[in-house]
């Protein structure tokens, strides 16, 4: 997540975000769930564009100052396949591997980005960063 955030600025493409996440995650032997994505934030909570957490560099919409969205990858220790349980909400890995999900809400500024969900006390930063 943080690697993808660090590249954010006007002019990069949405695919660059997914590529940054996917390449790092897969290099470490994990997988990125394909069934969920980040999303735009505006007058409605879930808006376009969809922010994929996998993909190819230099593809998709170009980021512009003023855009607001979430990046929220779900990373699996095994394969990326998931299923939704009968409660209609709970997502589990099909291969029963461990999984973790990370999320931030951000805005694109004239020169980069702002993390809206960052804690002033540092609670939003994992101790391993």
Put a short name on every predicted segment:
Residues 1-129:
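Active-site neighborhoods and metal-handling regions in enzymes and metal-associated proteins
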